[in-house]
Each structure stands twice: as C-alpha cells, then as structure tokens.
C-alpha cells in the first residue's frame, strides 16, 4: 500500500495480474470461513520431529521418496506439521477446512479461493511429483490425513481468481 499511496508513477490500470511468492513451507490451517486457526508453522519449526518419523515409518522412506521426490523432515515439509496438529491439537484439526502454505493464505485474502501451486505442494509430503501431480491418496491413507483438507492444486502460472480484497480494490487495483 505504501508504494501505491506514494504514487511512484504507477498506472494501476496497467497491472494485469498479481504474482504470489512466499516462504515455503509455512503451514496454515484454515477454518470454514477462511480464518487462520493457528499461527503458521514455519520451515524452521522442529516440533514435528516425532511426526516425521511416523510418516517415514508408515510409508517407508524409499516409497515416500519414490512418490514425492522428498523425505519427511520436521518443519521443512508441512506434512509433519499437519500430523502434529492432528495429534496435538485435535480440535483444530477437526475445524480445519483446508491446510495450505502462506501463499494459500495470500491467495485466499485476495481472491476468496483456496489453492496451492505444485511447487508448494511438493513440500507437503502428500503430493505425487512422480505420479501425476496430484495429492497422494496412498500416503494420506497411510498417515491418516484427510485428503479433503488439502487445497485445490494449480500450476504456478494459473489464475487463482479475480480480486475481491476491498483494500486492494480501494487502492485502484482491479
């Protein structure tokens, strides 16, 4: 807003889209009305060390890597944090409509729609990078994470939706 309010010679009518880039992973749990239920859990948070071991044991480290091209690491992959929430904050897990990263939060605030791009999804432990760019029912079933709580997937270049954020619209963006 500072850049827009200071002028800086911007012609807002020339802005055709807004790209989103964010720290990854930074896991957020969203309620039914889009409210953030817990502070985002960042990549450096190590509280889910035990959950990383549970994922590796349930799926198998070789199988997990075969499906996701990743391993389970506390904080560094958000699946461990999702499982931590399920095990330690069950009331939050039950209230969660979708899990997503910080970019999901930004998209939701701007468009009213939940989404994750493939690159962010690849940090979740639940995304098939080798099997069709989709959420893995195999891994979710083994770990006990409800697939319905994972957001719709998009390419990084896809349009999430139209701008509905009144603050941004009030600044002249469309």
Q: How would you name each of these model-derived features?
A:
Residues 2, 50-54, 84, 105:
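Generic beta-strand or strand-like secondary-structure segments
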Residues 32-36, 54, 58-59, 64:
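Hydrophobic or amphipathic alpha-helical targeting/insertion segments
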Residues 1-39, 50, 95, 169-174:
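N-terminal glycine/serine-rich phosphate-binding loop of ATP-dependent small-molecule kinases
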Residues 30, 65-174:
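Gly/Ser/Thr-rich active-site cleft segment
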Residues 41-42, 120:
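Residue-level structural signal for beta-strand termini and adjacent loop
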Residues 39, 51, 55, 109:
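Residues that scaffold the ATP/ADP-binding catalytic core of kinase and kinase-like folds
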Residues 45:
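Carbohydrate-associated surface elements
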